[in-house]
């Protein structure tokens, strides 16, 4: 089906969330973190739970992963089977997201970030 979402590390969550909401018109889906200190902000520009998620922290700005949305759960299973057959390292094996109920898995790629294959949610 296409690109589902992108997750990036962004040390300045406030400035980044402001960019996406005020300039690009995204809406905040949720904010997560302990004791009122945001560690992650999920934003959307369509009916999905999140189109982009921003993870805070002191590390460098970089892509954590992007998600490719499949047409069916069978497509997710087939992609996982192929990844395992060719020896692609699994970053996160098959499971369901708590926030959007997406069924997915994450694989490593040569660019040093993960690619998530998912369906539903």
Across the structure, where does each feature detected by a protein language model lie?
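Long C-terminal interaction/binding lobes of large macromolecular proteins
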Residues: 60
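Conserved beta-strand in the GNAT
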Residues: 52-54
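Vicinal oxygen chelate
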Residues: 1, 8-17, 68-115, 119-121
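Core segments of cupin and vicinal oxygen chelate
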Residues: 8-50
């Amino acid at each position: 089906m296409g690109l589902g979402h992108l997750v990036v590390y962004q040390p300045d969550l406030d400035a980044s969330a402001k960019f996406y909401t005020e300039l690009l018109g995204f809406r905040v889906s949720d904010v997560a973190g302990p004791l009122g200190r945001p560690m992650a902000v999920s934003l959307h520009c369509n009916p999905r739970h999140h189109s982009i998620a921003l993870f805070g922290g002191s590390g460098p700005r970089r892509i954590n992963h992007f998600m490719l949305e499949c047409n069916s759960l069978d497509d997710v299973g087939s992609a996982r089977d192929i990844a395992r057959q060719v020896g692609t390292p699994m970053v996160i094996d098959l499971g369901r997201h708590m926030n959007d109920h997406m069924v997915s898995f994450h694989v490593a790629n040569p660019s040093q970030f993960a690619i998530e294959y998912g369906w539903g949610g």
